[in-house]
């Protein structure tokens, strides 16, 4: 399908996923300059007043880039909003996003019609992340413009479904923008996501191992050194199932193979408990085996571009 504005001006079919604590203006700006959507969670900007400063910085730097590089303008950026009832900042954060006319808003953990209407009112679009077809239908019913299918293997809060099954079920009825998340970390995986019916790939964990990311050196090296077998799926830490690096769980004195279930009722995005969980226990997806070094975000995106072009060429030879 032809993607709607502003998703139609990417140099690569990628959205850099919003990473709690890790994503910051430096990373977002680097991603956008490299030609992919850069994003960050609104809750990363603490206190709330910092969100206005971040959006000013991102908007100003990308505008300056576009003026200096008219032949390779920056991709748009996105802000992730947690729509869960425990997020007491939502209304104020949305007002700040409206002030800066944020082009893309990614919504999570709840779909609200008024949020989607608000974004559309200032000319933006909303993408809602979901883990199954039922939630996908609810999101579109509430007015989301597109969907992010979070399949098995994705970093952070993630679903259990195969990407083949999840994309298939959604594409049976939805022909709008569809982004796939789950262990996508190289150019071949981006092409595979498109082949199964997604429009764009959603890549998060590899960007933890970038120079711009707000992550401890040990966290970055854990991504570089980790493999799929080093990822643990648990609901203990936030009340919602997610994927985490085994070594960080062990460092906290816990047994990764014997973790109790978390309680969904304890999920709280307003009091800082989430920040503590994600700072001590490191989220990561299963695709990190493709990450080989800590490097600038632009270098990683350039590598993805080369791999993506090579994968397309090789596939054409196989099908000729």
Question: Over which residues does each language-model region extend?
Answer:
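Conserved active-site-proximal phosphate/metal-binding subdomains
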Residues: 160-179, 185-320
């Amino acid at each position: 399908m032809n993607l709607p504005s502003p998703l139609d001006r990417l140099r690569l079919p990628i959205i850099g996923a919003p990473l709690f604590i890790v994503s910051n203006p430096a990373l977002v700006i680097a991603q956008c300059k490299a030609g992919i959507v850069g994003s960050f969670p609104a809750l990363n900007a603490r206190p709330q007043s910092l969100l206005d400063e971040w959006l000013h910085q991102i908007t100003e730097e990308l505008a300056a880039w576009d003026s200096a590089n008219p032949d390779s303008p920056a991709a748009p950026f996105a802000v992730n909003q947690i729509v869960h009832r425990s997020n007491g900042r939502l209304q104020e954060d949305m007002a700040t996003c409206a002030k800066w006319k944020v082009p893309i808003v990614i919504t999570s953990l709840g779909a609200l019609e008024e949020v989607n209407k608000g974004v559309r009112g200032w000319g933006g679009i909303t993408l809602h992340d979901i883990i199954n077809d039922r939630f996908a239908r609810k999101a579109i019913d509430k007015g989301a413009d597109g969907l992010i299918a979070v399949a098995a293997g994705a970093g952070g809060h993630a679903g259990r479904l195969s990407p083949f099954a999840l994309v298939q079920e959604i594409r049976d009825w939805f022909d709008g923008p569809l982004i796939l998340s789950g262990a996508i970390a190289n150019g071949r995986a981006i092409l595979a996501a498109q082949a199964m019916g997604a429009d764009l790939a959603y890549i998060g964990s590899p960007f933890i191992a970038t120079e711009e990311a707000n992550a401890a050196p040990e966290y970055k090296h854990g991504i570089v050194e980790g493999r799929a077998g080093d990822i643990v799926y648990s609901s203990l830490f936030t009340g919602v199932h997610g994927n985490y690096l085994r070594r960080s769980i062990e460092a906290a004195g816990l047994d990764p193979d014997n973790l109790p279930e978390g309680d969904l009722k304890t999920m709280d995005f307003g009091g800082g408990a989430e920040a503590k969980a994600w700072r001590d226990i490191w989220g990561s997806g299963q695709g990190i085996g493709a990450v080989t070094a800590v490097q600038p975000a632009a270098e990683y995106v350039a590598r993805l571009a080369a791999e993506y072009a090579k994968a397309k060429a090789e596939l054409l030879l196989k099908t000729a």
